[in-house]
């Protein structure tokens, strides 16, 4: 059994100090202010689904047509998955203008968080921030879409991009995407595309900051867990014990 040394304690404390300093700097430079946070949408999956769907929707109030939708579909792992399914994006933005984006769309086997209908395809985005998987959830969505005559393409969205439970997915082919990388980077790309439209740009930037905050909160929880695990590990015991 290995003893906890003074250096181990110093390293642990240094990690905590670095994180605390980073959080204080975040507050002081104004990034802690977030209208989405003030509206208490942080942890509500339905609210995030509506926000994401609004940006994806070619007919939404942002007035950008299918620009944001195309940018999302062109994300590397998203594009790889839809191409593998046979989904082809035609040249030019206009080809996606007819896409229909919905939230909480009712199917016989439940409600899908986000759906994108386009030319016989139905892209389903199952949004999981904190809620647990339901039994056979992805399998049921896949079957429900097939029953409509459309071809399903499934995405499983979480903060960190982890896999769905086997009880939910079974052998259904789906693609993992994350808020931390896929959504955050996509939102940043959308903000860059509307530099001349400050009201839309700042809304996107605010949402991007919220995603970073949620991702950082998850990192804090993971770090706390690692610290507790490290301090209670059987590999260490207090000096002199």
Per-region residue spans from a language model:
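Charged, terminal alpha-helix-loop-beta segments
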Residues: 1-241
């Amino acid at each position: 059994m290995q003893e906890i040394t003074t250096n181990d304690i110093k390293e642990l404390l240094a990690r905590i100090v670095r994180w605390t300093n980073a959080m204080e700097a975040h507050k002081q430079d104004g990034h802690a202010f977030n209208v989405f946070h003030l509206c208490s949408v942080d942890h509500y999956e339905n609210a995030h689904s509506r926000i994401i769907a609004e940006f994806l929707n070619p007919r939404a109030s942002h007035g950008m047509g299918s620009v944001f939708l195309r940018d999302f579909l062109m994300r590397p792992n998203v594009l790889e998955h839809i191409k593998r399914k046979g989904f082809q994006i035609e040249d030019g933005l206009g080809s996606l203008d007819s896409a229909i984006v919905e939230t909480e769309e009712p199917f016989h086997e439940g409600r899908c968080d986000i759906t994108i209908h386009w030319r016989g395809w139905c892209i389903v985005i199952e949004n999981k921030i904190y809620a647990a998987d339901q039994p056979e959830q992805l399998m049921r969505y896949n079957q429900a879409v097939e029953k409509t005559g459309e071809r399903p393409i499934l995405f499983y969205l979480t903060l960190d991009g982890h896999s769905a439970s086997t009880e939910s997915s079974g052998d259904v082919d789906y693609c993992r995407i994350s808020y931390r990388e896929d959504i955050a980077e996509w939102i940043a790309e959308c903000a860059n595309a509307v530099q001349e439209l400050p009201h839309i740009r700042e809304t996107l930037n605010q949402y991007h900051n919220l995603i970073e905050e949620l991702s950082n909160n998850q990192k804090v929880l993971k770090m706390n867990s690692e610290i507790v695990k490290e301090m209670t590990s059987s590999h260490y015991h207090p000096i002199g014990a």
